[in-house]
Amino acid sequence: MTEQALLTDARLYLCTDARTDRGDFADFVDAAYAGGVDIIQLRDKGLEAAEELELLEVLETAARRHGRLWSVNDRADIASLSGAPVLHVGQKDLPLASARKFLGGEAVIGLSTHSHGQIDAAIAASRGAGGLDYFCVGPVWATPTKPGRAAVGLELVRYAAEAAGKTTAKTTGGAAGPTVDGPRLPWFAIGGIDLGNVEQVAAAGAERIVVVRAITEADDPAAAARSLLAALDAGAS
């Protein structure tokens, strides 16, 4: 499958640090993929570039073994050097146009959003050649991984579901070209999501989720991933 096809089919996205305290990064990411995680992002602000590149090689090996995607947070230079198929940026990180210029048209690029206006802008940025490939909405609930950022609640998840549901595929002939029928722009709910509330997120309209502690703190990452996917299905039914 192409990277875009893998993104379209993705439902469970995991962000993890380097797990330096446990020393089990390779085993952990392999177990997470085995349990059904579709994308794993290495997000660890404390890493030196050389350390991050070394861990990304480990992540790439596991991703290829399972036929899944792997992602770099914030840094287009690291994404380029590592050959990562996915780059995720925040509102204050490298602008989409600059990231696209750096990485080229084949890279999958995602963006964090926290408001109605940012969601609308993300959807608008998906149109045309080199547009945005996916966006995340959150944090739905307060989370220690994003200290100081207020929770946006389920209302913004509902808004994203409605707004993204009105979109079509990327335009032909550049940004000014006519729209064509196709899949909706993929988006993920993120922030404080765990087994206890994932059904609420799904009921609000999210088909895809990003998690951190729900898997990183689990005794059995593979089982945790399977349980989250089952709950995501249950909430949507």
Curated annotation (Swiss-Prot):
GO terms for biological process: thiamine biosynthetic process; thiamine diphosphate biosynthetic process. Its EC number is 2.5.1.3. Its cofactor is Mg(2+). Keywords: Magnesium, Metal-binding, Thiamine biosynthesis, Transferase. GO terms for cellular component: cytoplasm. SUPFAM superfamilies: Thiamin phosphate synthase (SSF51391). One of its GO terms (molecular function) is thiamine-phosphate diphosphorylase activity. It is an enzyme of class 2 (transferase). Mg(2+) binds at residues 74, 93. Pathway: Cofactor biosynthesis; thiamine diphosphate biosynthesis; thiamine phosphate from 4-amino-2-methyl-5-diphosphomethylpyrimidine and 4-methyl-5-(2-phosphoethyl)-thiazole: step 1/1. Condenses 4-methyl-5-(beta-hydroxyethyl)thiazole monophosphate (THZ-P) and 2-methyl-4-amino-5-hydroxymethyl pyrimidine pyrophosphate (HMP-PP) to form thiamine monophosphate (TMP). HAMAP family: TMP_synthase. Belongs to the thiamine-phosphate synthase family. This is Thiamine-phosphate synthase.
